[in-house]
Amino acid sequence: MKKVISVRFKENGKSYYFDPAGADIKTGEYVIVETARGVECGEVVQGVKEIADSAVPKALKPITRMADSVDVRRMRQNREDEKRAYHTCQECIARHGLEMKLVEAEYTLDRSKIMFYFTADGRVDFRELVKDLAGIFHTRIEPVSYTHLT
């Protein structure tokens, strides 16, 4: 048996298991974790529980630390800013006449990059779009095709 917590990064998103690293973490608390996207702040939706070793992902990562009020404020501000980033990107896509559908915008906690998730029927040359967005947001821009996530 392995001790895990379940963490969610978006209000209605999927939850993921993390190693609580010996901490007594309760549902509703926030933790800082390292994910494939970078450092993230997530809400604990299931406190410490034991599950069968066979149900644990092979690469179970430990939490980095408990989130503090600054982290939670930053996460909430990022969610608000993602809405504006989404609309700005939509305008840029239209201006460039690109055949793609923007699905979502997402900042990393430290704002070192914004991921713009999109779908497209064919190949899209978004190099000029990325340049424009980098000039507007002054951070790394990462376009992510949903077709490549499955």
Locate each region found by the language model.
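N-terminal, positively charged regions that mediate nucleic acid binding
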Residues: M1-A52
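A common structural junction motif
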Residues: L133-R140
